[in-house]
Amino acid sequence: MIFMILGRSKEFILKLPIWTQIITYIAILVYALSFFGISTGVLSLSWIGLLQKRQLYEIITYVTLHLSMLHIVFNFVSLLPAMSQFEKKQGTLACILVTVIPYTLFPGIMHLIVYHFFLRKDYVSIAGLSGWAFAFISASCVHSPQRLISFFNLFSIPAYCFPIIYLIMTTILVPKASFIGHASGAVMGYCTPFMLGSIPLKSWAQNVDPIFQSWVKNYHSFDQLSHAQLPIAEPLSTFSSFPGKGTRLGG
C-alpha cells in the first residue's frame, strides 16, 4: 500500500511543470533532512534571525520549511494544482518571477514588520508554502471574478470572494495559522495581473525560453494569448478544502 502511494506520488510529481516540480522536491528534501538529525529550523524567518543574526537567506528559505507531515501534505494539496496550472498557462519564467520575488518577499517582510513593530515578538518565525497557495488561488480567482465557486457544496460565492472566505476559515479552524502570511499571499495573488503587466515579460521570455525549452523537460514557454488573459487562461475547476497550516515556529 505504501509503495503504491509512493509510486503514484512520484508519477504525479514528474508530470508537474519544471518549476513546480523543483519546489516540490526541495520542500520534500528539507523535510526529510530533519529525520537525519539535521536542524532545519534555521531556514525559518524571524526578525532575530534575519536582522540580528544577519541570516539573510531566511527571507527566501522560509517557504521550503515545514514542521510536520500534515503541514507539508496540506500545503501541497492546496498549492500544487493552482501553481502548476499557472505555470502551464503563463510560462515557467513568469512563475519563477512571481514566486521568488512578490510571493516570497512580501509575506516575509510583512511578517517581520507586524511582529517587530506591533506585536513585539521578534522570536516568532514563519515557515511553509501556504502563503504561495493563497497567492496562486487568488491569482486564479482574479481571472474570472464573477464565476461562482461551490463552497463545500453548501452554497456558491463569486470567485473574487473565495480567497477571503478561505482566509477567514483557515484562521479560525487551523491552530497557529499565519494570518499575516496568508493574507499577504492573497494580496499578491490579487495583484498578479498588474505585476506581470508592468514588466517586459514577453521580451524576457523571447530571450530565455528558447534556451531552456530545448533541453529542460516540462519547461513551459511564455504564451502571449494566455498572458493577455492574466492571470491564467483557464479557471481552476476546483480548490482544495484545506489550505495548509501555515505554521509559525516558536509561537
Curated annotation (Swiss-Prot):
Topological region Cytoplasmic: 1-21, 80-93, 144-153, 200-251
Effect upon mutating A127D: Abolishes proteolytic cleavage of sre1 and sre2 cleavage
Broadest EC class assigned to this enzyme: hydrolase
Gene: rbd2
TM region positions: 22-42, 59-79, 94-114, 123-143, 154-174, 179-199
EC number per UniProt: 3.4.21.105
Alphabetical list of InterPro entries matching this protein: Peptidase_S54_rhomboid_dom (IPR022764), Rhomboid-like_sf (IPR035952)
Principal localisation: Golgi
Topology class, membrane: Multi-pass membrane protein
Name used for this protein in its record: Rhomboid-type serine protease 2
Residues in the Lumenal compartment per record: 43-58, 115-122, 175-178
Ranges in a coiled coil: none
Residue ranges, annotated region (SHP box): 225-251
Outcome of swapping S130A: Abolishes proteolytic cleavage of sre1 and sre2. Does not affect interaction with cdc48
Disulfide bond residue pairs: none
Biological process according to GO: proteolysis; SREBP signaling pathway
Enzymatic reactions: Cleaves type-1 transmembrane domains using a catalytic dyad composed of serine and histidine that are contributed by different transmembrane domains
Family in the record: Belongs to the peptidase S54 family.
Keyword Protease among UniProt keywords: yes
Molecular function terms, GO-annotated: protein-macromolecule adaptor activity; serine-type endopeptidase activity
Disruption phenotype: Defective grow in response to low oxygen levels. Impaired cleavage of sre1 under hypoxic conditions and increased degradation of precursor protein via proteosome. In a dsc1 mutant background, results in defective proteolytic cleavage of sre1 but restores its precursor levels.
Resulting phenotype, A186T: Abolishes proteolytic cleavage of sre1 and sre2 cleavage
Cellular compartment(s): Golgi apparatus membrane; Golgi apparatus, cis-Golgi network membrane
Known outcome of mutating G246R: Impairs interaction with cdc48. Results in defective growth in hypoxic conditions, lack of sre1 cleavage, and decreased levels of precursor sre1
Subunit (UniProt): Interacts (via C-terminal SHP box) with cdc48; the interaction is required for rbd2-mediated cleavage of sre1 and sre2.
Function recorded in the entry: Rhomboid-type serine protease that catalyzes intramembrane proteolysis. Upon binding to cdc48, required for sterol regulatory element-binding protein sre1 activation by mediating its release from the membrane and thereby regulating its activity under hypoxic conditions. Upon binding to cdc48, required for the processing of sterol regulatory element-binding protein sre2.
GO terms for cellular component: Golgi apparatus; Golgi membrane
Biological source species: Schizosaccharomyces pombe (strain 972 / ATCC 24843)
